[in-house]
Amino acid sequence: MTPVSSRPRHWVIGDVHGCADSFEQLLKRLPAGDRLIICGDAINRGPAIEATMTRIWELVEQGRAVWLRGNHEQDLIQALRGGSWQQQRQLAGCDTFRHLGETNCRRWLERLEHLPLAYWGDGWVATHAGFDPVSWQPDLRVRMGFWQHYDGRFGEVVIGHTPGPHVRRLPHIVMVDTGACYGGELSAYCPETREVVAVPGLRPETPRALPGLRTPLSSGGAIAGR
């Protein structure tokens, strides 16, 4: 295990999406006394969803981690709370619901409902996708509108939500989702030092291509990791 650092820092971890093995490997690479910020979308997609949720919650209860809400957690909350046929159909297509079953999902519901939307650090903030460029409230689905209009008012914003081949930097924005569930990496970024730590993500027999999303990198680029 990496030694405890003299001054605890923060590590913002990208979308885990049920990749429990990668998450454990990443934990071994991070200083034991530092704070972990799970940047939402810990559930769905990967092969070990319940193990991922349980492990993260253990860290939350120990006071070591903060689990932020992502759009996948929000969708599950809304589907479990609703009774419409559209929401029941949404549950039927939810990986977490299929893996855990209705009883276990409902046991998790209150915890998920209390997940915060953002974590505010000293000169930086972590949130799942960004902020609405009109209200400047956390938005779990925003992409281009935030990337193009964020003016640095909150300092550096560290987000997940949009996967890419490496941790990317835009003006005042750092994007830490590196596609662990697509055969990419699971990455952690330290806002205090701008250091990146990454481990291999899921290695499926047939790798899934990253979603075809374009990220405006002309004013930024990759952040080297170790």
Label each PLM-derived region with a short phrase.
Residues D15, D41, G70-N71, L112, ...:
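Divalent metal-coordination and catalytic microenvironments
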Residues H17-S22, N44-P47, H72-Q78, Y119, ...:
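Active-site environment of divalent metal-dependent phosphoester hydrolases
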Residues M1-R55:
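N-terminal active-site segment of His-dependent metallophosphoesterases
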